[in-house]
A protein has these predicted regions:
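Alpha-helical scaffolding within the catalytic cores
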Residues: 248, 273-281, 332-338
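Active-site-adjacent mobile loop/cap segments within catalytic or ligand-binding domains
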Residues: 327-381
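Solvent-exposed loop/turn segments at secondary-structure junctions
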Residues: 180-183, 231-235, 266-271, 298-301, ...
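Active-site-adjacent substrate-binding region
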Residues: 306-333
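N-terminal catalytic or cofactor-binding beta/alpha core of small enzyme domains
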Residues: 20, 31-259, 268-273, 367, ...
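A short, glycine/acidic-enriched catalytic loop
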Residues: 193-198, 269-304
Length: 381
């Protein structure tokens, strides 16, 4: 009887080793497995609440796994964010059916720091008549020569000795650049980098780009204009005017129809303490670099017998700019300078802003220059 009971009730407890295995299995089922399950569940819940959990949803989507990131920096949204641009909702088995899976928002742009201790001062020059600045209508001329006031004023707004034809088949205007590599501030902040030279051989960033806008707009307005994009100041700055003189002479020989030669530059205005001046004015809601015409005078040694005719043209051009766009200009600088202005009676140098302006401000100004030139030429018809 006892032997039978032992055989039927304890068939699996035949050895001590088998008895130990049984006890371990029982312990795993009753205690260890539930404890581990609870631990993993609590760990996941805690990390999800903090917002730092990253896990793979392969169990939810056996077709394609994506990583789900809880972003505590972003405003609350029901839309999950995934670190892939691919949208997996095309798959009908996708558990995110009905959601829009978006790429994570890019991090906020780090604002560049330009506080180098080298400041830029914004200034709008307002013209006013005084002992050396003369006014006729809306034309202002700053006379720093020894030529009398009455003699200078008598030239202002007199008729030019040339007319620019509209809709001509032949070039009437030449836009060129003696200092073509002059460029502008490469950021909008009111500090400048003293290591940055404001010179650039890239024609999309230097004076060639400003001249191109003037050229294109004048052609649109019916005035046949050509542009020379030679970098006369590169690789050598010295001798720039000698080289640009040769260029202009070649164009005049090839196109004797040219009446106006405009040498487009930018200025460089800086105070003794190192502060750079940014001459700017807001016109039609846009910031524009203020401009200044330089008309040269002969001191007896510059070989400019017709310099007063250039001044006449400058005064008409200035008058148009100020009539159309008040405060757009600084007074014409009338000084003993040559700048190859002896080559035609319509030769002028124009400064479009300064090295503290931005390229965008210069481009905005270029459009107004073109409209003003067209207005000046329209008055000659």
């Amino acid at each position: 009887m006892c032997n039978f009971f032992t055989i039927t009730v304890s068939p699996y407890l035949h050895t001590d080793k088998e008895t130990e295995v049984y006890r371990l299995k029982k312990l795993w089922i009753l205690f260890i497995f539930p404890a581990l399950s609870a631990f993993f569940l609590l760990t996941f819940w805690e990390k999800a609440a903090v917002g730092t959990a990253k896990f793979t949803l392969s169990a939810m989507n056996p077709i394609k796994a994506v990583k789900y990131v809880i972003n505590t920096d972003a405003p609350f949204s029901d839309t999950p964010v995934v670190n892939s641009e691919q949208n997996y909702t095309d798959n009908p088995t996708n558990p995110f059916e009905g959601f829009t899976l978006a790429s994570p928002s890019p991090p906020p742009l780090k604002q560049p720091v330009y506080d180098t201790g080298c400041p830029i001062a914004v200034m709008t020059y307002v013209s006013a008549a005084d002992d050396i600045t003369y006014k006729k209508q809306n034309c202002y001329v700053k006379n720093v020569t020894k030529i009398s006031r009455s003699e200078v004023e008598s030239e202002l707004l007199q008729e030019t000795d040339f007319k620019v034809k509209k809709n001509s088949d032949e070039p009437q205007i030449l836009i060129m650049h003696t200092h073509a590599t002059e460029s502008y501030q490469n950021h909008p902040e009111l500090y400048y980098d003293p290591e940055y030279t404001c010179r650039d051989t890239d024609v999309t960033k230097n004076m060639v780009s400003v001249g191109k806008i003037i050229t294109d707009k004048l052609n649109d307005l019916g005035y046949n204009t050509i542009q020379d994009a030679t970098l006369h100041d590169y690789p050598n700055y010295n001798g720039s005017y000698d080289r640009s003189k040769v260029t202009v002479e070649k164009y005049l020989a090839q196109y004797p129809s040219i009446k106006v030669v405009l040498d487009v530059h930018r200025d460089a205005i800086e105070r003794s303490d190192g502060t750079r001046i940014k001459p700017v004015v807001t016109i039609n809601g846009k910031d524009c670099a203020q401009v200044m015409i330089i008309s040269g005078a002969d001191n007896g040694y510059l070989n400019m017998p017709d310099f007063k005719k250039n001044l006449r043209f400058a005064s008409h051009f200035q008058n148009s700019m100020e009539s159309l766009y008040p405060t757009f200009t600084r007074p014409i600088l009338f000084d003993y300078r040559n700048y190859n202005q002896q080559l035609t009676t319509g030769s002028l140098l124009i400064e479009v802003g300064g090295h503290a302006n931005t390229l965008e401000e210069a481009h905005n100004a270029a459009k107004l220059i073109a409209y003003s030139l067209a207005d000046t030429f329209d008055g000659m018809q």
